[in-house]
A protein has these predicted regions:
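Conserved catalytic cores of very large enzyme subunits
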Residues: 2-136, 154-174, 178-481
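Conserved functional hotspot residues or short segments at active or partner-binding sites
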Residues: 144
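Long acidic/polar interaction regions in large eukaryotic complex-forming proteins
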Residues: 137-141
Length: 481
């Protein structure tokens, strides 16, 4: 029936539109409505003809990998800003009820760039004769190769697109030999991660990762500082090409962060030409997506600080700053190994993880709005004779709320992410199902600084200086201050 409706729509038979709307499922209507909001003025016809759902009934199996292949082959390819990007937001992988999508993930793009799919197939460990994981990995590799072959065979009159298409599928089987290849390989896999419905996936430490390719190109006379900067500018603009589609809530909240600075594995500070290029690019283009996060420490140079401040002053919101020394020490105290935290990253905006060793999920549960506990305590109208008694009441309220948001979750599988995690391949386990070294679960605590400031103000003005009462505080909240 749907094929006949599509044929009639293509023929511009107007009376079919109301009929088509009645035959579309509720889920499809929801997505069409959402997509029209995201895109602006897009016709029902265009969305109905191009929007397609791929229901993955058996995540983590060979059947799922076959569905990936079908979806990859049907999805369109974007050529914009001088690079190929095979992400089609109108081809949607649909998860069964009860499966929680993987979000807020940062792949290790140093492994992605050096990856060889043939070697992965040869070296993957069989753990039993009927190894579901291995079959699924073989299937996902076939899906990736099929997509690369499709790109290779694309007909294009654009000389640059034709040039890039020639990279495929060869770059899937070796390390990159130029900055241009490295950028294209990152974009290829990044697009597939998005196509797999892994929202909020970051780019990681690109100044550390890309510098070796840039240096080689400069030594060979292939690139200059300015030409490399132009390529990285195109890279950033293309990542933001689908911002509306990649934003599950607020426009621009995509989790597409580029991490700069910080120490490398040997403890040396990373400040190179690529670092400077990204800061200069974001100062010039003034876009909110993607974003920069800068890992700072006591060795961060004054010149870098000045560039960061200049970039921030244009209103783009980048870079955010990470006090890496403090965060790494806290991660070790929490349970991460000291030898791993040098490769600290964030899962989206701020939640720490170890790049290449983590499938930590920091946004799967309902968020806790901390100031709500203070509000509930004040509404009860108890007489608090000391600040400590009020603080204890707020803590007790939080202790009641926290267990209410915790639940057991059945996560989606990611054979695609598993390809680039050595622990997954060695264990024979999927990225989100005990394959990675770390998989901590987190609950978002919203408004912690607000709660702290509120409590400090109450202590000062209510209990210490006796200028106002708790009833005054409650009235201020009720009347929007």
């Amino acid at each position: 029936m749907n094929n006949k409706i599509k044929w009639l729509l293509k023929k511009n038979i107007s009376f079919i539109k109301p009929i088509a709307k009645k035959l579309v499922s509720k889920n499809q209507k929801k997505y069409i409505y959402t997509w029209r909001i995201m895109l602006g003025k897009v016709s029902f016809k265009e969305l109905f003809l191009n929007l397609e759902f791929f229901r993955d009934e058996y995540p983590g199996t060979f059947l799922s990998a076959k569905l990936y292949r079908k979806m990859f082959l049907k999805s369109d390819v974007t050529f914009a800003y001088n690079y190929i990007y095979p992400f089609d937001p109108l081809k949607i992988r649909f998860l069964p009820e009860g499966i929680t999508a993987l979000v807020s993930i940062t792949p290790d793009y140093s492994c992605v760039l050096k990856s060889d799919l043939r070697r992965i197939k040869q070296e993957i460990t069989f753990h039993n004769e009927e190894d579901k994981f291995v079959d699924t990995v073989y299937g996902i590799i076939d899906a990736v190769e099929a997509k690369a072959d499709k790109i290779k065979k694309r007909q294009s009159c654009n000389e640059r697109e034709h040039f890039l298409s020639a990279f495929f599928p060869e770059i899937l089987y070796r390390d990159c030999i130029s900055l241009d290849e490295a950028i294209q390989k990152i974009l290829f896999y990044n697009a597939l991660f998005w196509q797999a419905r892994h929202w909020h996936n970051g780019l990681g430490r690109l100044d550390l990762i890309l510098n070796q390719y840039y240096i080689r190109d400069v030594e060979l006379g292939i690139e200059t500082y300015e030409s490399a900067k132009r390529r990285l500018k195109d890279f950033c603009l293309l990542l933001g090409y689908h911002t509306k589609f990649k934003s599950p809530g607020l426009i621009g909240d995509t989790g597409q962060y580029i991490l700069l600075g910080g120490i490398d594995k040997e403890g040396n500070n990373v400040e190179n030409d690529i670092t400077y290029m990204f800061l200069e690019i974001f100062t010039e283009i003034k876009v909110p997506d993607p974003k920069l996060i800068f890992r700072v420490n006591d060795k961060t140079s004054t010149e870098i600080w000045n560039l960061c401040i200049k970039c921030l002053s244009n209103g783009c919101g980048s870079p955010l700053f990470m006090n890496e020394t403090l965060i790494m020490n806290n991660m070790v105290e929490f349970g991460y190994e000291r030898e791993d935290v040098w490769n600290l990253g964030t899962s989206a905006c701020w939640e720490p993880l170890v790049i290449g060793k983590s499938s930590c999920q920091n946004n799967p549960f309902k968020s806790i709005v901390l100031c709500d506990s203070l509000y509930r305590v004040l509404k009860k109208g108890r007489d608090f004779y000391s600040f400590q008694s009020l603080l204890l009441a707020v803590k007790n309220d939080l202790a009641i709320e926290v267990p209410l948001v915790i639940e057991d979750l059945n996560y989606d599988y990611s054979p695609l992410m598993s390809l680039f995690d050595s622990d997954c391949l060695n264990k024979g386990k999927d990225f989100s199902h005990k394959g990675t070294k770390y998989m901590y679960q987190g609950v978002q605590l919203l408004g912690l600084p607000n709660l702290v400031n509120s409590l400090l103000n109450i202590k000062k003005y209510v209990f210490d200086r006796h200028l106002i009462t708790l009833d005054d505080c409650l009235n201020a909240i009720a009347n929007n201050y």
